[in-house]
Design a protein with these regions (language model features):
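A helix-centric hydrophobic-segment signal that preferentially recognizes long
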Residues: 1-159
């Protein structure tokens, strides 16, 4: 009868590990989705900050780029790619502006928030992608059930 107790203990341990793995993988994927939403909000906030300066000299191109950023949703893969290109164009245009104390602080703060949100999102996506290769996650085929999180390929706005 002792072998039955050992068998029950092994099954319980494997079941607990499987439950822990599923919970961890799902939690990391949920965090990646949440951080992507936060990144999109910070990118929208930066575009709105740029739109405050409509009519200022030298801001015509940057305002047009900010409008194109706001106009592109990120729901499909193609829209996401277009949004990445638009964000990169906006970042490059903002770098080319000569800083003016009237608006430089607002844009620097918005860029820092975007950079922080981008870094957090990248970290969560990295962790979620790594969790998909855990042996128990592969055995339970979690990589088929959960969509693979995607990195945002945007330039660092703080450089």
């Amino acid at each position: 009868m002792w072998w039955l107790a050992v068998l029950v203990a092994i099954v319980a341990a494997v079941g607990a590990y499987a439950t822990w793995t599923v919970t961890r993988v799902e939690r990391l994927h949920r965090r990646a989705r949440t951080s992507e939403s936060a990144l999109l909000n910070k990118l929208d906030d930066r575009a709105e900050t740029v739109l405050k300066f409509v009519g200022q000299p030298g801001f015509d191109e940057v305002v047009a780029l900010a409008l194109s950023v706001v106009a592109v949703p990120a729901e499909t893969q193609r829209q996401r790619e277009l949004r990445e290109y638009a964000e990169n164009d906006l970042t490059r245009a903002l770098r080319e502006l000569h800083p003016d104390p009237a608006w430089a602080d607002d844009l620097e703060a918005a860029n820092r928030r975007v950079a922080l949100a981008r870094q957090i999102h990248t970290d969560f996506v990295r962790d979620a992608v790594a969790s998909r290769s855990l042996p128990m996650a592969v055995l339970l085929r979690l990589h088929h059930r959960l969509p693979r999180p995607q990195y945002w390929d945007i330039e660092d706005p703080v450089q």
